[in-house]
A protein has these predicted regions:
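Well-ordered alpha-helical scaffold segments within catalytic/enzyme domains
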Residues: 77-93, 139-153, 196-209
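N-terminal glycine-rich cofactor-binding segment that shapes the pocket for flavin-like pterin cofactors
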Residues: 102, 133, 146-150
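Lumenal/extracellular "mature" regions of secretory-pathway glycan-modifying transferases
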Residues: 128-129, 175-186, 211
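Aromatic-lined, polymer-binding surfaces characteristic
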Residues: 134, 141, 190-194
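Active-site cradle of extracellular carbohydrate-active enzymes
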Residues: 191-194, 201-205, 212-224
């Protein structure tokens, strides 16, 4: 009981010291209240839920025309970043539990092991194959590396390394280097893949002290 009281007092003190943290907590609570898909760890794409909703940002027109019950990877992945930020800002263990019990189990619904290298696809992997975007996976890699830094959990670092292998598969010598935007449509090498890609590589270097990540990070930074 004393431990619970202490956590409540600490959370209250932090929130009052920084009103932005309180706003962030309220935003996250509202998101889960309004977007949660019943009986899952997944989220809806929009609110109120519209069964006729169609995504307009997928590379494949066939996928874009499909009606989907759950959110796509890109909006879902924002919860990973949000919970990480709150965990780092508050050091409140409830966010660590939220990460382990809701965010990551839901995220794994998007993990695609039918194609190599393994990576996260734009829609849940129990459905027909969907596009895999390098920029989406870069941000997930950053989040996994940050989670490792905060918790010391080795599994998070291993997942980040696995994602990095996928990112490297999207790099070639066309235009002198750089990472493509989408695995299925290698038509452009966008800043949204390469700038955070450099950040991801350098975070991996900080976590591992492996010079290969430092080299790749510098190359992506200079190319971008």
């Amino acid at each position: 009981m004393n431990g619970l009281l202490l956590n409540v007092i600490c959370a209250f003190t932090i929130a009052n010291a920084n009103p932005n943290i309180e706003k962030a907590q309220q935003t996250l609570d509202a998101l889960y209240q309004n977007y949660t898909a019943p009986n899952t760890c997944l989220l809806r794409e929009n609110y109120p839920f519209d069964q006729d909703n169609k995504a307009t940002y997928l590379a494949s027109e066939e996928q874009a025309k499909r009606r989907n019950e759950y959110s796509y990877l890109w909006p879902y992945s924002g919860t990973f970043s949000a919970v990480n930020a709150l965990l780092e800002s508050t050091e409140n263990k409830k966010y660590k539990k939220l990460l382990e019990n809701k965010v990551l189990p839901g995220l794994e619904e998007y993990f695609d092991t039918r194609r190599e290298p393994f990576a996260y696809s734009s829609y849940i992997s129990s459905q027909p194959l969907s596009d895999r975007f390098y920029d989406d996976n870069v941000w997930l890699g950053i989040d996994f590396t940050d989670s490792y830094r905060m918790t010391g959990k080795q599994a998070y670092l291993e997942k980040a390394k696995l994602i990095w292998k996928f990112i490297l598969s999207g790099k070639d010598d066309v235009l002198g280097g750089g990472i493509y935007w989408c695995e299925q449509k290698k038509e452009s090498k966008n800043t949204c893949s390469n700038a955070p890609g450099a950040v991801f590589a350098l975070k991996l270097f900080q976590a591992t002290q492996d010079d290969a990540y430092l080299k790749e990070g510098k190359e992506l930074y200079e190319w971008t």
